[in-house]
Protein backbone atom coordinates (compact mmCIF):
# COMPACT_ATOMS: atom_id res chain seq x y z
CA UNK A 1 0.00 0.00 0.00
CA UNK A 2 2.83 2.41 0.94
CA UNK A 3 4.69 1.64 -2.28
CA UNK A 4 1.55 2.39 -4.27
CA UNK A 5 1.12 5.77 -2.54
CA UNK A 6 4.80 6.64 -3.05
CA UNK A 7 4.60 5.71 -6.72
CA UNK A 8 1.59 7.97 -7.22
CA UNK A 9 3.29 10.82 -5.32
CA UNK A 10 6.46 10.53 -7.41
CA UNK A 11 4.30 10.30 -10.54
CA UNK A 12 2.47 13.53 -9.71
CA UNK A 13 5.60 15.45 -8.60
CA UNK A 14 7.48 14.43 -11.74
CA UNK A 15 4.57 15.37 -13.96
CA UNK A 16 3.98 18.76 -12.39
CA UNK A 17 7.70 19.59 -12.33
CA UNK A 18 7.96 18.76 -16.01
CA UNK A 19 4.79 20.59 -16.99
CA UNK A 20 5.56 23.77 -15.09
CA UNK A 21 8.84 24.21 -16.99
CA UNK A 22 7.54 24.09 -20.54
CA UNK A 23 6.59 26.96 -22.85
CA UNK A 24 3.11 26.40 -24.19
CA UNK A 25 0.78 27.92 -26.74
CA UNK A 26 -2.99 28.23 -26.43
CA UNK A 27 -4.17 25.08 -28.25
CA UNK A 28 -5.20 23.14 -25.17
CA UNK A 29 -7.83 20.76 -26.51
CA UNK A 30 -6.58 19.71 -29.93
CA UNK A 31 -5.53 16.41 -28.40
CA UNK A 32 -7.70 13.42 -29.35
CA UNK A 33 -7.32 12.08 -25.84
CA UNK A 34 -8.31 15.28 -24.11
CA UNK A 35 -11.08 15.11 -21.56
CA UNK A 36 -14.54 15.21 -23.11
CA UNK A 37 -16.20 18.28 -21.65
CA UNK A 38 -19.58 17.92 -20.05
CA UNK A 39 -22.65 19.27 -21.76
CA UNK A 40 -22.82 23.04 -22.05
CA UNK A 41 -25.58 25.42 -21.18
CA UNK A 42 -29.07 24.40 -22.16
CA UNK A 43 -31.20 26.35 -24.59
CA UNK A 44 -33.45 28.95 -23.03
CA UNK A 45 -36.95 27.71 -22.26
CA UNK A 46 -39.53 29.32 -24.51
CA UNK A 47 -42.64 28.39 -22.53
CA UNK A 48 -44.60 31.17 -20.81
CA UNK A 49 -44.95 29.29 -17.53
CA UNK A 50 -43.64 31.25 -14.53
CA UNK A 51 -42.52 28.12 -12.66
CA UNK A 52 -39.16 28.50 -14.34
CA UNK A 53 -39.65 32.00 -15.69
CA UNK A 54 -37.31 34.91 -16.29
CA UNK A 55 -36.67 35.44 -12.59
CA UNK A 56 -35.18 31.95 -12.37
CA UNK A 57 -32.79 32.56 -15.26
CA UNK A 58 -29.47 34.25 -14.54
CA UNK A 59 -28.47 36.43 -17.48
CA UNK A 60 -24.86 36.70 -16.36
CA UNK A 61 -23.04 34.44 -13.94
CA UNK A 62 -22.06 36.33 -10.81
CA UNK A 63 -19.22 33.87 -10.21
CA UNK A 64 -17.99 33.00 -13.72
CA UNK A 65 -15.20 30.80 -12.35
CA UNK A 66 -17.63 28.52 -10.49
CA UNK A 67 -19.43 25.51 -11.97
CA UNK A 68 -22.09 24.15 -9.63
CA UNK A 69 -24.52 21.33 -10.27
CA UNK A 70 -27.04 19.62 -7.99
CA UNK A 71 -28.84 16.49 -9.18
CA UNK A 72 -31.62 14.60 -7.43
CA UNK A 73 -32.04 11.00 -8.63
CA UNK A 74 -34.83 8.52 -8.03
CA UNK A 75 -35.10 4.94 -9.23
CA UNK A 76 -38.17 2.69 -9.04
CA UNK A 77 -38.80 -1.00 -9.70
CA UNK A 78 -42.11 -1.51 -11.58
CA UNK A 79 -41.90 -5.27 -10.95
CA UNK A 80 -42.14 -4.65 -7.19
CA UNK A 81 -44.99 -2.14 -6.90
CA UNK A 82 -42.62 0.68 -7.92
CA UNK A 83 -40.56 0.30 -4.78
CA UNK A 84 -37.68 2.78 -4.49
CA UNK A 85 -34.28 1.37 -5.47
CA UNK A 86 -32.40 4.64 -5.84
CA UNK A 87 -32.71 7.94 -3.99
CA UNK A 88 -29.60 10.04 -3.90
CA UNK A 89 -28.48 13.65 -4.11
CA UNK A 90 -25.33 14.52 -6.04
CA UNK A 91 -23.48 17.83 -5.92
CA UNK A 92 -20.73 18.72 -8.40
CA UNK A 93 -18.48 21.68 -7.66
CA UNK A 94 -15.85 22.69 -10.18
CA UNK A 95 -13.71 25.42 -11.63
CA UNK A 96 -11.59 25.84 -14.74
CA UNK A 97 -9.24 28.36 -16.27
CA UNK A 98 -5.78 29.25 -17.46
CA UNK A 99 -2.69 28.32 -15.47
CA UNK A 100 -0.21 31.13 -16.18
CA UNK A 101 0.17 31.80 -19.90
CA UNK A 102 1.04 28.25 -20.78
CA UNK A 103 -1.70 25.94 -19.67
CA UNK A 104 -5.26 25.15 -18.72
CA UNK A 105 -6.75 23.24 -15.82
CA UNK A 106 -10.03 21.88 -14.50
CA UNK A 107 -11.07 20.56 -11.09
CA UNK A 108 -14.42 18.99 -10.23
CA UNK A 109 -15.47 17.50 -6.89
CA UNK A 110 -18.49 15.25 -6.52
CA UNK A 111 -20.36 14.64 -3.27
CA UNK A 112 -23.12 12.01 -3.08
CA UNK A 113 -25.70 11.57 -0.33
CA UNK A 114 -27.51 8.21 -0.26
CA UNK A 115 -30.95 8.32 1.37
CA UNK A 116 -32.32 5.37 3.43
CA UNK A 117 -34.39 4.00 0.54
CA UNK A 118 -31.33 3.83 -1.74
CA UNK A 119 -29.81 0.40 -2.37
CA UNK A 120 -26.34 1.75 -1.48
CA UNK A 121 -27.44 3.10 1.92
CA UNK A 122 -26.73 -0.16 3.75
CA UNK A 123 -23.03 -0.05 2.84
CA UNK A 124 -22.36 3.64 2.16
CA UNK A 125 -24.35 6.67 3.31
CA UNK A 126 -22.27 9.35 1.61
CA UNK A 127 -19.29 9.72 -0.67
CA UNK A 128 -16.88 12.48 -1.68
CA UNK A 129 -14.44 12.09 -4.55
CA UNK A 130 -12.45 13.98 -7.15
CA UNK A 131 -14.56 13.53 -10.26
CA UNK A 132 -11.93 15.06 -12.52
CA UNK A 133 -8.81 17.20 -12.13
CA UNK A 134 -6.16 17.90 -14.72
CA UNK A 135 -3.57 20.31 -16.05
CA UNK A 136 -2.86 20.52 -19.77
CA UNK A 137 -0.01 22.35 -21.46
CA UNK A 138 0.83 22.83 -25.13
CA UNK A 139 4.12 23.92 -26.63
CA UNK A 140 5.19 23.92 -30.26
CA UNK A 141 3.97 20.57 -31.63
CA UNK A 142 3.58 18.89 -28.22
CA UNK A 143 0.72 18.66 -25.76
CA UNK A 144 1.00 17.15 -22.28
CA UNK A 145 -1.66 16.40 -19.72
CA UNK A 146 -1.64 15.09 -16.15
CA UNK A 147 -4.53 14.39 -13.80
CA UNK A 148 -7.80 12.50 -13.57
CA UNK A 149 -9.77 12.40 -16.81
CA UNK A 150 -10.96 10.02 -19.53
CA UNK A 151 -9.17 8.73 -22.61
CA UNK A 152 -11.27 7.58 -25.54
CA UNK A 153 -9.66 4.94 -27.74
CA UNK A 154 -11.18 3.55 -30.91
CA UNK A 155 -14.10 4.69 -33.02
CA UNK A 156 -17.02 3.16 -31.11
CA UNK A 157 -17.65 4.07 -27.48
CA UNK A 158 -17.42 0.90 -25.41
CA UNK A 159 -16.15 -1.02 -28.44
CA UNK A 160 -13.23 -3.35 -29.09
CA UNK A 161 -10.54 -0.71 -28.52
CA UNK A 162 -12.32 1.65 -26.10
CA UNK A 163 -10.97 -0.26 -23.09
CA UNK A 164 -8.90 2.31 -21.16
CA UNK A 165 -11.59 3.75 -18.88
CA UNK A 166 -14.07 1.47 -17.09
CA UNK A 167 -17.80 2.11 -17.42
CA UNK A 168 -20.29 2.52 -14.61
CA UNK A 169 -21.92 -0.83 -15.42
CA UNK A 170 -24.35 -2.53 -17.76
CA UNK A 171 -27.14 -0.04 -17.07
CA UNK A 172 -24.80 2.95 -16.62
CA UNK A 173 -22.28 2.92 -19.49
CA UNK A 174 -20.73 6.33 -18.74
CA UNK A 175 -16.93 6.20 -18.50
CA UNK A 176 -15.15 6.64 -15.15
CA UNK A 177 -12.13 9.03 -15.11
CA UNK A 178 -8.74 7.72 -13.98
CA UNK A 179 -5.33 9.23 -13.14
CA UNK A 180 -3.15 9.53 -16.25
CA UNK A 181 -0.02 11.15 -17.57
CA UNK A 182 -0.25 11.60 -21.33
CA UNK A 183 1.58 13.37 -24.14
CA UNK A 184 0.86 13.96 -27.82
CA UNK A 185 3.16 14.94 -30.70
CA UNK A 186 1.44 16.60 -33.66
CA UNK A 187 2.53 16.35 -37.28
CA UNK A 188 1.00 17.85 -40.45
CA UNK A 189 -1.60 15.13 -41.00
CA UNK A 190 -0.99 12.77 -38.09
CA UNK A 191 -0.37 12.59 -34.36
CA UNK A 192 1.40 10.26 -31.94
CA UNK A 193 0.14 9.99 -28.35
CA UNK A 194 1.14 8.07 -25.23
CA UNK A 195 -0.48 7.52 -21.84
CA UNK A 196 0.61 5.99 -18.54
CA UNK A 197 -1.52 4.94 -15.57
CA UNK A 198 0.19 3.76 -12.39
CA UNK A 199 -2.95 2.57 -10.62
CA UNK A 200 -5.75 1.45 -13.00
CA UNK A 201 -9.24 1.25 -11.56
CA UNK A 202 -10.71 -2.26 -11.48
CA UNK A 203 -14.44 -2.81 -10.91
CA UNK A 204 -15.49 -5.74 -8.74
CA UNK A 205 -18.09 -6.75 -6.19
CA UNK A 206 -17.44 -5.43 -2.69
CA UNK A 207 -17.96 -9.01 -1.46
CA UNK A 208 -14.98 -10.32 -3.44
CA UNK A 209 -11.24 -9.98 -2.81
CA UNK A 210 -8.87 -8.90 -5.58
CA UNK A 211 -6.13 -11.50 -5.36
CA UNK A 212 -3.33 -9.99 -7.45
CA UNK A 213 -1.52 -6.66 -7.12
CA UNK A 214 -2.30 -3.66 -9.29
CA UNK A 215 -0.26 -3.42 -12.49
CA UNK A 216 0.81 -0.38 -14.48
CA UNK A 217 -1.07 0.41 -17.65
CA UNK A 218 0.32 2.19 -20.70
CA UNK A 219 -0.44 2.62 -24.37
CA UNK A 220 0.37 4.36 -27.65
CA UNK A 221 -1.84 5.67 -30.45
CA UNK A 222 -0.72 6.80 -33.91
CA UNK A 223 -3.44 8.54 -35.90
CA UNK A 224 -3.59 9.67 -39.52
CA UNK A 225 -6.15 12.20 -40.75
CA UNK A 226 -7.30 12.79 -44.30
CA UNK A 227 -10.29 14.41 -45.95
CA UNK A 228 -13.39 12.42 -45.03
CA UNK A 229 -11.50 9.66 -43.24
CA UNK A 230 -9.35 8.94 -40.17
CA UNK A 231 -7.42 5.87 -39.08
CA UNK A 232 -5.27 4.93 -36.10
CA UNK A 233 -2.99 2.17 -34.82
CA UNK A 234 -3.05 1.22 -31.13
CA UNK A 235 -0.53 -0.65 -28.94
CA UNK A 236 -0.67 -1.13 -25.19
CA UNK A 237 -0.54 -3.14 -22.01
CA UNK A 238 -3.94 -2.83 -20.38
CA UNK A 239 -5.55 -4.02 -17.17
CA UNK A 240 -9.12 -5.39 -17.44
CA UNK A 241 -11.70 -2.84 -16.32
CA UNK A 242 -13.71 -5.61 -14.65
CA UNK A 243 -12.06 -8.19 -12.43
CA UNK A 244 -12.72 -11.82 -13.42
CA UNK A 245 -13.59 -14.45 -10.83
CA UNK A 246 -11.49 -17.61 -10.83
CA UNK A 247 -14.09 -20.37 -10.58
CA UNK A 248 -11.45 -22.69 -9.11
CA UNK A 249 -10.42 -20.68 -6.01
CA UNK A 250 -13.26 -18.12 -5.78
CA UNK A 251 -10.89 -15.13 -5.91
CA UNK A 252 -11.03 -12.34 -8.50
CA UNK A 253 -8.10 -11.30 -10.68
CA UNK A 254 -7.19 -8.45 -13.02
CA UNK A 255 -3.87 -9.21 -14.70
CA UNK A 256 -2.66 -7.23 -17.73
CA UNK A 257 -3.06 -8.23 -21.33
CA UNK A 258 -1.43 -6.91 -24.49
CA UNK A 259 -3.37 -5.20 -27.28
CA UNK A 260 -2.63 -4.31 -30.87
CA UNK A 261 -5.51 -2.62 -32.66
CA UNK A 262 -6.62 -0.65 -35.68
CA UNK A 263 -9.52 1.78 -36.01
CA UNK A 264 -10.90 3.86 -38.84
CA UNK A 265 -13.87 5.96 -39.88
CA UNK A 266 -15.07 6.99 -43.32
CA UNK A 267 -17.64 9.68 -44.09
CA UNK A 268 -20.22 9.05 -46.80
CA UNK A 269 -23.07 11.27 -47.96
CA UNK A 270 -25.62 10.05 -45.44
CA UNK A 271 -23.65 8.25 -42.74
CA UNK A 272 -20.32 7.73 -40.98
CA UNK A 273 -18.81 4.25 -41.08
CA UNK A 274 -16.79 3.19 -38.02
CA UNK A 275 -14.61 0.10 -37.67
CA UNK A 276 -12.35 -1.24 -34.89
CA UNK A 277 -10.37 -4.47 -34.63
CA UNK A 278 -8.04 -5.58 -31.83
CA UNK A 279 -5.93 -8.65 -31.08
CA UNK A 280 -5.73 -9.23 -27.33
CA UNK A 281 -3.02 -11.51 -25.93
CA UNK A 282 -3.01 -13.20 -22.48
CA UNK A 283 -6.66 -12.54 -21.67
CA UNK A 284 -7.78 -14.40 -18.54
CA UNK A 285 -10.36 -17.13 -18.99
CA UNK A 286 -11.92 -19.98 -17.02
CA UNK A 287 -11.66 -23.62 -17.96
CA UNK A 288 -12.89 -26.63 -16.00
CA UNK A 289 -10.50 -26.86 -13.04
CA UNK A 290 -8.15 -24.24 -14.50
CA UNK A 291 -7.63 -20.49 -14.79
CA UNK A 292 -5.84 -19.87 -18.08
CA UNK A 293 -4.79 -17.14 -20.50
CA UNK A 294 -6.03 -17.06 -24.10
CA UNK A 295 -5.79 -14.94 -27.24
CA UNK A 296 -8.93 -13.17 -28.47
CA UNK A 297 -9.85 -11.19 -31.57
CA UNK A 298 -12.40 -8.40 -31.02
CA UNK A 299 -13.97 -6.25 -33.72
CA UNK A 300 -16.94 -3.94 -34.19
CA UNK A 301 -18.61 -2.24 -37.12
CA UNK A 302 -20.95 0.73 -36.73
CA UNK A 303 -23.07 3.01 -38.91
CA UNK A 304 -23.71 6.53 -37.56
CA UNK A 305 -26.59 8.03 -39.56
CA UNK A 306 -27.56 11.69 -39.12
CA UNK A 307 -30.77 13.07 -40.64
CA UNK A 308 -31.43 16.62 -39.40
CA UNK A 309 -31.84 16.21 -35.62
CA UNK A 310 -32.53 12.48 -35.83
CA UNK A 311 -29.54 10.24 -35.26
CA UNK A 312 -29.31 6.47 -35.73
CA UNK A 313 -26.47 4.29 -34.47
CA UNK A 314 -26.31 0.65 -35.58
CA UNK A 315 -23.41 -1.53 -34.43
CA UNK A 316 -22.20 -5.14 -34.45
CA UNK A 317 -19.56 -6.46 -32.06
CA UNK A 318 -17.70 -9.77 -31.98
CA UNK A 319 -15.38 -11.40 -29.42
CA UNK A 320 -13.74 -14.46 -31.00
CA UNK A 321 -11.57 -16.85 -28.96
CA UNK A 322 -8.56 -17.94 -31.01
CA UNK A 323 -7.91 -20.60 -28.37
CA UNK A 324 -10.98 -22.67 -27.56
CA UNK A 325 -12.05 -25.94 -25.96
CA UNK A 326 -15.46 -27.37 -25.12
CA UNK A 327 -14.84 -27.08 -21.37
CA UNK A 328 -14.27 -23.30 -21.40
CA UNK A 329 -16.49 -21.53 -18.87
CA UNK A 330 -17.94 -18.06 -18.36
CA UNK A 331 -18.81 -16.89 -14.81
CA UNK A 332 -22.41 -15.83 -14.34
CA UNK A 333 -23.38 -12.76 -12.32
CA UNK A 334 -23.86 -15.06 -9.32
CA UNK A 335 -20.39 -16.57 -9.77
CA UNK A 336 -21.51 -19.90 -11.25
CA UNK A 337 -19.75 -21.21 -14.35
CA UNK A 338 -21.74 -21.65 -17.57
CA UNK A 339 -20.51 -22.95 -20.91
CA UNK A 340 -18.53 -20.43 -22.97
CA UNK A 341 -19.05 -19.98 -26.69
CA UNK A 342 -16.18 -19.45 -29.07
CA UNK A 343 -17.71 -16.38 -30.70
CA UNK A 344 -19.81 -13.89 -28.73
CA UNK A 345 -21.84 -11.57 -30.94
CA UNK A 346 -23.60 -8.42 -29.74
CA UNK A 347 -25.85 -5.97 -31.58
CA UNK A 348 -27.05 -2.48 -30.79
CA UNK A 349 -29.55 -0.09 -32.39
CA UNK A 350 -30.33 3.36 -31.03
CA UNK A 351 -32.22 6.38 -32.30
CA UNK A 352 -32.60 9.87 -30.83
CA UNK A 353 -34.32 13.07 -31.91
CA UNK A 354 -35.37 16.45 -30.54
CA UNK A 355 -38.55 18.51 -30.77
CA UNK A 356 -40.09 21.64 -29.31
CA UNK A 357 -37.32 23.97 -30.56
CA UNK A 358 -34.83 21.36 -29.30
CA UNK A 359 -35.99 21.81 -25.69
CA UNK A 360 -37.12 18.18 -25.66
CA UNK A 361 -35.12 15.13 -26.70
CA UNK A 362 -36.11 11.47 -26.80
CA UNK A 363 -34.09 8.31 -27.34
CA UNK A 364 -34.68 4.58 -27.82
CA UNK A 365 -32.11 1.78 -27.80
CA UNK A 366 -31.94 -2.00 -27.91
CA UNK A 367 -28.89 -4.12 -27.09
CA UNK A 368 -28.65 -7.85 -27.79
CA UNK A 369 -25.58 -9.24 -26.03
CA UNK A 370 -23.67 -12.54 -25.91
CA UNK A 371 -25.53 -14.32 -28.72
CA UNK A 372 -28.92 -13.22 -27.40
CA UNK A 373 -28.23 -14.31 -23.81
CA UNK A 374 -29.31 -10.79 -22.82
CA UNK A 375 -31.72 -8.35 -24.44
CA UNK A 376 -31.76 -4.82 -23.00
CA UNK A 377 -34.26 -2.16 -24.08
CA UNK A 378 -34.27 1.43 -22.85
CA UNK A 379 -36.05 4.72 -23.48
CA UNK A 380 -35.22 8.27 -22.40
CA UNK A 381 -36.97 11.64 -22.43
CA UNK A 382 -34.96 14.79 -21.64
CA UNK A 383 -36.30 18.29 -21.07
CA UNK A 384 -34.06 21.37 -21.13
CA UNK A 385 -36.26 23.62 -19.03
CA UNK A 386 -34.01 26.69 -19.14
CA UNK A 387 -30.36 27.65 -18.72
CA UNK A 388 -30.25 26.26 -15.19
CA UNK A 389 -32.74 23.39 -15.02
CA UNK A 390 -32.94 20.02 -16.75
CA UNK A 391 -35.15 16.97 -16.19
CA UNK A 392 -34.76 13.42 -17.48
CA UNK A 393 -37.02 10.36 -17.38
CA UNK A 394 -35.76 6.93 -18.44
CA UNK A 395 -36.83 3.31 -18.37
CA UNK A 396 -34.93 0.03 -18.75
CA UNK A 397 -36.06 -3.55 -19.25
CA UNK A 398 -33.88 -6.68 -19.50
CA UNK A 399 -34.84 -10.11 -20.78
CA UNK A 400 -32.20 -12.80 -20.12
CA UNK A 401 -31.96 -16.51 -20.91
CA UNK A 402 -32.12 -19.09 -18.15
CA UNK A 403 -28.95 -20.94 -17.13
CA UNK A 404 -26.71 -18.41 -18.86
CA UNK A 405 -24.33 -15.71 -17.59
CA UNK A 406 -27.01 -12.99 -17.23
CA UNK A 407 -29.87 -15.17 -15.98
CA UNK A 408 -30.02 -13.26 -12.68
CA UNK A 409 -30.99 -10.10 -14.58
CA UNK A 410 -34.07 -11.61 -16.22
CA UNK A 411 -37.14 -9.34 -15.90
CA UNK A 412 -34.98 -6.46 -14.61
CA UNK A 413 -37.11 -3.29 -14.70
CA UNK A 414 -36.25 0.26 -13.71
CA UNK A 415 -37.77 3.70 -14.09
CA UNK A 416 -35.44 6.59 -13.27
CA UNK A 417 -36.12 10.28 -12.78
CA UNK A 418 -33.45 12.98 -12.54
CA UNK A 419 -33.80 16.69 -11.89
CA UNK A 420 -30.67 18.81 -12.26
CA UNK A 421 -29.81 22.40 -11.44
CA UNK A 422 -26.59 23.88 -12.76
CA UNK A 423 -25.00 27.27 -12.22
List PLM regions with ranges.
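N-terminal periplasmic/intermembrane-space "pro-region" immediately following the signal or transit peptide
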Residues: 22-84, 94, 122
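Detector for outer-membrane/organellar transmembrane beta-barrel domains
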Residues: 265-367
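Hydrophobic, lipid-facing positions within transmembrane beta-strands of outer-membrane proteins
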Residues: 87-93, 128-133, 177-181, 216-220, ...
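Outer-membrane beta-barrel "beta-signal"
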Residues: 397, 409-423
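Transmembrane beta-barrel strands of outer-membrane/channel proteins
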Residues: 66-74, 107-113, 146-148, 194-198, ...
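Repeated loop/turn-to-beta-strand initiation elements of outer-membrane beta-barrel proteins
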Residues: 64-66, 101-107, 141-144, 189-194, ...
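Outer membrane beta-barrel
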Residues: 96-202, 400
